[in-house]
């Protein structure tokens, strides 16, 4: 506990909040170009081939982003939109690719939770 004299000499300083998605630079989304599209395996209790892409952003960062949904059309030089949000079982993956925007098409034959995967409403 500081004395009153110590507080007069130098005031208390605010703790800086550490952002969970620094590459977005305080923006909700960022555009980027895929430099590599590949699959990777998750952490210990889980087993799968998760689809991820290495993306060079307009902010100058190069990040690893997860490609959600079943099937995708992304390849090298595809232009994608990135949002924040980590994948718990993939270390170092702190971003998601937004489906249904720019070069990333929506998930085909998706009936429920369509807005998260950029799928249009199916015709009756």
Curated annotation (Swiss-Prot):
The keyword rRNA-binding applies. Residues 113-124 have a biased composition (Basic residues). It holds the Pfam family Ribosom_S12_S23. PROSITE patterns: RIBOSOMAL_S12 (PS00055). Keywords: Methylation, Ribonucleoprotein, Ribosomal protein, RNA-binding, rRNA-binding, tRNA-binding. CDD domains: Ribosomal_S12. Residues 104-124 are annotated as: Disordered. GO terms for molecular function: rRNA binding; structural constituent of ribosome; tRNA binding. The modification 3-methylthioaspartic acid is found at residue 89. GO terms for cellular component: small ribosomal subunit. GO terms for biological process: translation. Gene3D superfamilies: Nucleic acid-binding proteins. The keyword Nucleotidyltransferase does not apply. InterPro entries: NA-bd_OB-fold (IPR012340), Ribosomal_uS12 (IPR006032), Ribosomal_uS12_bac (IPR005679). Part of the 30S ribosomal subunit. Contacts proteins S8 and S17. May interact with IF1 in the 30S initiation complex. With S4 and S5 plays an important role in translational accuracy. This is Small ribosomal subunit protein uS12. The gene is rpsL.
